[in-house]
Amino acid sequence: MYGNYSHFMKFPTGFGGSPGHTGSTSMSPSAALSTGKPMDSHPSYTDTPVSAPRTLSAVGTPLNALGSPYRVITSAMGPPSGALAAPPGINLVAPPSSQLNVVNSVSISEDIKPLPGLPGIGNMNYPSTSPGSLVKHICAICGDRSSGKHYGVYSCEGCKGFFKRTIRKDLIYTCRDNKDCLIDKRQRNRCQYCRYQKCLVMGMKREAVQEERQRSRERAESEAECANSGHEDMPVERILEAELAVEPKTESYGDMNTENSTNDPVTNICHAADKQLFTLVEWAKRIPHFSDLTLEDQVILLRAGWNELLIASFSHRSVSVQDGILLATGLHVHRSSAHSAGVGSIFDRVLTELVSKMKDMQMDKSELGCLRAIVLFNPDAKGLSNPSEVETLREKVYATLEAYTKQKYPEQPGRFAKLLLRLPALRSIGLKCLEHLFFFKLIGDTPIDTFLMEMLETPLQTT
């Protein structure tokens, strides 16, 4: 029927042959599909039959069909016996026939099969796994926006939490329908059984949840061990012993006041600080690990913090004094006397920011000792040979103080933070005191570095 049409085809001069050659040229359908070039022989379709699988393999997938520069024509009466392909620029017009049609696509539904495995899950509405959807990170379970890859699958926080709870609590669900419930963003909470099954089908791993729990437990145990080792390495009992060893007995002072001295308040404070500077070195030697530092670093730390350390001591000693401070010599310095001497502003700061706060929270000796140890171990002091070691010691004191407050004052969860808030005020007041030259006459003509070196080299006196 189509013999005359399909047997011979005339091409323009020079196409597929030698230059200047004209005449009839025929081509094999299979050759045309495989090479796109005309053949020199003139067989009929019956000479070289082409099977249906070969023709479909030439077409391949819809992407191949759309990407090909040729138009493939097949017969709808049965398996096509051949196909004609036209090179670019040449139009082939099929003879009028209702029995010919153009195959331009392949049904996608025939190529994609439902996921094998669990019964009823094949009918669920699975999100697309095309490259575009992966870029958007859609939850593979319900289609909501993904927050990342959880337990091996891109999923939202809701599905992640649902799967984790199911595994950790070893929950068992049942489906009220046919185990094929639709799981999407709006209906993901309707059936927990089908949601959990879909989590498994999409690739969520039970062992990933168990490993995460094990890692969390190991991390918590490690942190607890570090904290315990810090407490053992910097025991609060030794810090308290250091405080008690150098603090004078205040009960022997009685009701002594500034009237017992003819000196002005500034001179009295300087004399008291002079006396306390000797005991300050003894106190530092009793703090755990301070003596393990190099002698040069010990001098640097004491030189950087001695004013704050002394101010903290007499501030805490003065919590029982009304409107004044109690010096280590047993003398009281009243607010009015300080104002008369021209140092009223800094004196007021000591009373309001330190003495009053210590009194309100009833700061004990152990807490005072820890705060002073934190001041002593200052990793920012200039000239330290090993600031990281000093920082490690300070962190140990932090851990010791926090553990102590939690154990001693469990009803005050914010006590540790309140204690640390006194440190900035102490630092600011200490700098202001240096500006007022309070302590510049402490040791006469002896340079403070020389004095500290001599004191630190003196063996610790044990009682």
Swiss-Prot record:
A Pfam family the protein falls into: Hormone_recep
Compartments in which it is found: Nucleus; Cytoplasm
Domain NR LBD: 231-459
Gene Ontology MF, one: nuclear steroid receptor activity
Any single GO CC term annotated in Swiss-Prot or TrEMBL for this entry: cytoplasm
Extent of Polar residues compositional bias: 21-33
Entry superkingdom: Eukaryota
InterPro entries to which the protein is assigned, alphabetical: NHR-like_dom_sf, Nuc_recep-AF1, Nucl_hrmn_rcpt_lig-bd, Nuclear_hormone_rcpt_NR2, Nuclear_hrmn_rcpt, Retinoid-X_rcpt/HNF4, Znf_hrmn_rcpt, Znf_NHR/GATA
Keywords tagged on the record: Cytoplasm, DNA-binding, Metal-binding, Nucleus, Receptor, Transcription, Transcription regulation, Zinc, Zinc-finger
Modulating, as annotated region: 1-138
Task of the protein: Receptor for retinoic acid. Retinoic acid receptors bind as heterodimers to their target response elements in response to their ligands, all-trans or 9-cis retinoic acid, and regulate gene expression in various biological processes. The RAR/RXR heterodimers bind to the retinoic acid response elements (RARE) composed of tandem 5'-AGGTCA-3' sites known as DR1-DR5. The high affinity ligand for RXRs is 9-cis retinoic acid.
Sequence similarity: Belongs to the nuclear hormone receptor family. NR2 subfamily.
Domain notes: Composed of three domains: a modulating N-terminal domain, a DNA-binding domain and a C-terminal ligand-binding domain.
Protein name: Retinoic acid receptor RXR-gamma
Name of the gene this protein is made from: RXRG
